[in-house]
């Protein structure tokens, strides 16, 4: 009876994906997941976990959700597969409101939405093969089809040689690969990642991110992830939203948000990735100049790779590069430079105006003698 009801659902089960080496880019004109005025208040809590969320997630993109602890990240993520029921507003998937779905239609929906977690949730008494196969057995998939699918997925995640191994014999990264394979058994269109790399070391994290990027590219999945690791967002996401106390405070392309964060919460979250002064120079910074010959210290956030000699000449005086670097996010070169400017004919206000002609964001860090 459940299968018959699922077939009548307005959102049909996804057709099996066919792997392709062609990169699939997000469709900028199509919202795969849409939040409209979304709110969530838990019983006994005066402060809503989510409030007034209006947000689109594009089909085929990797979308990041960041924020401080308690900002509402997990609550928002779990409304997509209705593990959390919103108190207000709507969640639309392919323009269909999922709020009225009965149990049968929810089953059909959740088979289209895979999910991986920080903790791998593998069954210790079952092999890698059996862990991946289990959801297919529960769904009543025929044995031949189960074998084909499990074999295909273990090859995709690089575990073909580990199919008869038990979880206790696997590394953390290998366990997460099993979790990813299991999340893909029903050919989902959306993959939710809840702190999927936070229990892994940096090298293993990099390999899991590359796997997620490959899955997104080859299968065209929409990937939505939450993480407290800003480097993960920088390395893999197309766009990002910043939550604070259940509300959206900033959103946009990752290179734009990371290159010139506007909200104080975003700046705080990104601080570990920011270029910093050496401690010896930091200790000598003053809020105001101690003498007429004191240098002003500026931090410039740049998009692209400017001609430094022209920049220095434009600022006037004696310009010294104290710290800096350029990295690529997506297809965009982003740089941060910390400069000291001494003896410029321009005052601090004029220096800031001149520097803003070169940089997306300029900050006065202080003055040094």
Swiss-Prot record:
UniProt GO cellular component terms: plasma membrane
Reaction equations catalysed: L-methionine(out) + ATP + H2O = L-methionine(in) + ADP + phosphate + H(+); D-methionine(out) + ATP + H2O = D-methionine(in) + ADP + phosphate + H(+)
Primary location recorded for the protein, binned into one broad class: membrane
Coiled-coil blocks: none
Pfam families from the UniProt entry: ABC_tran (PF00005), NIL (PF09383)
InterPro entries: AAA+_ATPase (IPR003593), ABC_transporter-like_ATP-bd (IPR003439), ABC_transporter-like_CS (IPR017871), ACT-like_dom_sf (IPR045865), MetN_ABC (IPR041701), MetN_ABC_transporter-like (IPR050086), NIL_domain (IPR018449), P-loop_NTPase (IPR027417)
Superkingdom of origin organism: Bacteria
Disulfide linkage: none
Annotated ATP binding sites: 67-74
Keywords: Amino-acid transport, ATP-binding, Cell inner membrane, Cell membrane, Membrane, Nucleotide-binding, Translocase, Transport
Region Disordered, annotated ranges: 1-22
Keyword ATP-binding: yes
Topology class, membrane: Peripheral membrane protein
Location of the ABC transporter domain: 33-270
Molecular function (Gene Ontology), one example: ABC-type D-methionine transporter activity
Enzyme Commission number: 7.4.2.11
Subcellular location: Cell inner membrane
Subunit relationships: The complex is composed of two ATP-binding proteins (MetN), two transmembrane proteins (MetI) and a solute-binding protein (MetQ).
Protein function: Part of the ABC transporter complex MetNIQ involved in methionine import. Responsible for energy coupling to the transport system.
Family: Belongs to the ABC transporter superfamily. Methionine importer (TC 3.A.1.24) family.
Protein name: Methionine import ATP-binding protein MetN 1
Record organism: Pseudomonas entomophila (strain L48)
């Amino acid at each position: 009876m459940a299968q018959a009801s699922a077939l009548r659902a307005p959102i049909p089960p996804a057709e099996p994906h066919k792997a392709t080496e062609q990169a699939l880019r997000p469709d900028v004109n199509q919202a795969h997941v849409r939040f409209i005025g979304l709110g969530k208040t838990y019983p006994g809590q005066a402060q809503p976990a989510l409030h007034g969320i209006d947000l689109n997630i594009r089909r085929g993109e990797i979308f990041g959700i960041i924020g401080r602890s308690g900002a509402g990240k997990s609550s928002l993520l779990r409304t997509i597969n209705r593990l959390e029921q919103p108190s207000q507003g709507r969640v639309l998937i392919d323009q269909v409101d999922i709020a009225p779905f009965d149990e049968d239609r929810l089953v059909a929906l959740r088979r289209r939405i895979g999910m991986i977690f920080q903790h791998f949730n593998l069954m210790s008494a079952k092999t890698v093969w059996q862990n991946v196969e289990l959801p297919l057995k529960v769904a009543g998939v025929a044995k031949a089809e189960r074998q084909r699918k499990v074999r295909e997925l273990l090859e995709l995640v690089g575990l073909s040689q580990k199919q008869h191994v038990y979880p206790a014999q696997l590394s953390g990264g290998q366990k997460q690969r099993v979790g990813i394979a299991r999340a893909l058994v029903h050919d989902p269109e959306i993959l939710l990642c809840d702190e999927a790399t936070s229990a892994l070391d940096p090298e293993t994290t990099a390999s899991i991110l590359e796997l997620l990027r490959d899955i997104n590219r080859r299968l065209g999945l929409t990937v939505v992830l939450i993480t407290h690791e800003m480097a993960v967002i920088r390395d893999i996401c197309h766009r990002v939203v910043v939550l604070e106390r259940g509300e959206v405070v900033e959103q946009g392309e990752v290179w734009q948000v990371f290159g010139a964060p506007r909200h104080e919460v975003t700046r705080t979250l990104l601080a570990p990735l920011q270029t910093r002064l050496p401690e010896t120079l930091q200790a000598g910074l003053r809020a105001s100049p101690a003498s007429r010959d004191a240098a002003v210290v500026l931090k410039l956030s740049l998009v692209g790779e400017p001609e430094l000699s022209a920049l220095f000449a434009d600022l006037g005086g004696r310009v010294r590069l104290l710290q800096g670097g350029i990295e690529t996010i997506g297809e965009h070169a982003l740089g941060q430079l910390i400069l000291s400017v001494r003896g410029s004919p321009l005052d601090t206000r004029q220096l800031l105006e001149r520097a803003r002609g070169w940089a997306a964001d300029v900050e006065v860090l202080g003055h040094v003698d």
